[in-house]
Amino acid sequence: MSITTMKGVTSESPAEALSRFQTTGLTLNNPKDLYWMTEFLKEEFYDKGNYYYPIKTVCDGELIETELFCPFEPKLSPHYIQLYNSRDERSNLYAVPPKKTDMKKYNRINCEKMGSLMAPNSNYDDTEMVSLFYSMMYYLNDQTAHLKLPEEDIQPELVDELNDHVLQYLSVFLSIFKPREPQDLERIWNFLDFYQPYFKKVDGKIILHEKYQGRTPPQIGLIKKITGYVLERFAPKKNITQVIYEVIRYIKGIKQEIKIRGDKSFTLSLKEYDEFRDQVTSSPMAHSITDLTYDDFSYKAYMNPLFIKLEDLTSEIITYFNDVCTCDRERLDDDPFNSVFILRDLHSLNYVKSCDLVVKHAHDKLSKFLEIKQTLLKESTNENEKKAIAQMIKTREDSLIGYTIHEICCVTNGYARDHKPLMKDYLEKNIFKKLKATN
């Protein structure tokens, strides 16, 4: 596909798209526009061997102009338009009746966009499920938002309520877990860690103690939609242990975040920050779903220390890209969980230089990612294993470039957590120029 052949996807020629853009500008509330932006970035950067993508934003009045290195091919799912157009129906999952979903918040999360960019090769249902996992992460994470308040303003009952909700969510995920091997049961049981006392093992399953069964928490419809799909689509033929593992990892990370946020005097080194963020990045959950969609699947890869390192690097790179793009919002929120702030304080830098340093660290991590990729492929013992590992690595590569494009294309306020007017101006200027040249 190219800019000149986009009509097969968007049902509009370059001339028709240009005419529309000159009236509306680039937006995120017309799903066609994301195809034009993605294809433009692919042709102007990836196809020309330039893997440095521009980011233009502002932090505390400082102009941030940097480049995110990501040497993988940008692609948007062919199902994105259909996913976007069915979002009103999907939004019903996010509130317990009679309450209704806050569409302002739902639009800002824009999970269909993330899923379609970060899992572009999956079928419709699988792409929807990846999107739902990303939205689950945002909704769970937002339930810790009140912990950013001054310590004296934090309401203990809200902390208890969040813990109750988390137990219900964990219980639903564990209800679909039917271990194929005894070691799978023990792996999950041991990984529950400080949540273990709330659960018990009964007939090869892990269930929540009756006394902790609470009232129906928000987003339970979302959780049941995800677990029902995993149970029907994957559990009969494949080992779903990693899905459960990654959900527990993320939820444990939220608990750790609560603990850290409770200590307003905390400091983190960059190494400690990486280790913490490895636990509270949603991409491993989404990857565990996408991995299952392929015939070539290796559960034992998750036990390989090198593959675990590759997964962690993916999380860290996405986190660093996110930190650069969200630093102004998080500065205004007085949220210290950001590598830009850590390096700024450590080296007495301004925001511009700190962002540049974060981007450099991300580049170094991506170089390490590529080294590990080659080692994993070289060490594969047979062709089937090599094919499975290659596909699982490709899933992580798709996430990295998908997240990069996601941040670049935040061009509509209210349809992105971090609207970027400067990127909107950049994309409109260059896409309009390219479309005019095709006429």
From Swiss-Prot:
Cofactor: Mg(2+)
SUPFAM superfamilies from the UniProt entry: Terpenoid synthases
Keywords noted in UniProt: Magnesium, Metal-binding, Transferase
Catalytic activity, as annotated: dimethylallyl diphosphate + L-glutamate = prekainate + diphosphate
Record has Transferase as a keyword: yes
UniProt pathway annotation: Secondary metabolite biosynthesis
Binding site for Mg(2+) 1: N322, T326, E330
Binding of Mg(2+) 2, residues: E330, F337
EC number(s) from the headed UniProt entry: 2.5.1.-
MF GO annotations: metal ion binding; transferase activity
Pfam families (UniProt xref): Terpene_syn_C_2
Function in brief: Magnesium-dependent glutamate N-prenyltransferase: part of the gene cluster that mediates the biosynthesis of kainic acid (KA) and derivatives, natural products with neurochemical activity acting as ionotropic glutamate receptor (iGluR) agonists, thus being neurotoxins. Catalyzes the conversion of L-glutamic acid (L-Glu) to prekainic acid in the presence of dimethylallyl diphosphate (DMAPP). Can also use geranyl diphosphate (GPP) as substrate, thus leading to the formation of N-geranyl-L-glutamic acid (L-NGG).
Family affiliation: Belongs to the terpene synthase family.
Name of this chain's protein: Magnesium-dependent glutamate N-prenyltransferase
Species assigned in the record: Digenea simplex
Gene: kabA
